[in-house]
Regions:
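Conserved acyl-donor/pantetheine-binding loop and adjacent beta-alpha core of acyl/acetyltransferases
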Residues: 1-5
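A conserved beta-strand-loop-helix scaffold within acyl/acetyltransferase catalytic domains
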Residues: 22-182
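Conserved acetyl-CoA pyrophosphate-binding loop and the N-cap/start of the following alpha-helix
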Residues: 10-20, 182
């Protein structure tokens, strides 16, 4: 969510705060500091040494009348509804099923599979992964009902997954991946 990130009473104090962040980052041997999704009126505060991060986020909101997936489809035109139904039928015919697993239900194999999928996605896109398997174990233990894995299964074998975190009435999905299939 975009909003104020540099909490200071005026631009002079905000620049001093950012200078302190820069100095602390350098003094601690860190490669960078990030202030994401700041308000547009804070743009002028980020001068030399700060890079703009261009990013895209997708937010899906239920207008309140979708209680089922069929309710959701009913709001689409015929072509899109038909395409989605055909895609889902193709997945079903392929024998793929889905498991929804909370952190306290996740087995070692579930966490390892999700971590493999996550690593594969980062390798495919040439990025450095930040999450370790130990971190997934930490999430499962500390956020047992907030951590949610959606695993696509080919028989007993997980072939794809999404890692989500649940908060209140919102589901945050950020990490996903899948096995290479023939």
């Amino acid at each position: 969510v975009t909003g104020p990130r540099v909490l200071a009473r005026d631009p002079e104090h905000a620049r001093a705060l950012l200078a302190a962040v820069t100095a602390w980052t350098a003094a601690n041997g860190l490669s960078s500091a990030h202030i994401n999704f700041h308000a547009a009126d804070e743009d002028a505060l980020f001068e030399d040494g700060w890079l703009l991060r261009e990013d895209i986020q997708y937010h899906w909101t239920n207008p309140g009348h979708w209680q089922t997936f069929d309710d959701y489809l009913a709001d689409m035109d015929h072509k899109h509804r038909k395409n989605i139904r055909q895609e889902r039928a193709k997945v079903t015919r392929a024998g793929i099923t889905f498991r929804v697993v909370h952190g306290d239900e996740a087995s070692e194999a579930d966490l390892q599979a999700m971590h493999r999928f996550y690593l594969q996605t980062f390798m495919d896109y040439g990025n450095a992964p930040a999450l370790t398997l130990e971190f997934l174990h930490h999430l499962a233990a500390r956020l047992p009902r907030q951590l949610l894995l959606v695993l696509a299964m080919d028989g007993e074998r997980p072939v794809a997954g999404a890692l989500c975190l649940r908060g209140g009435d919102t589901l945050y999905g950020r990490y996903w991946g899948g096995a290479s299939l023939p």
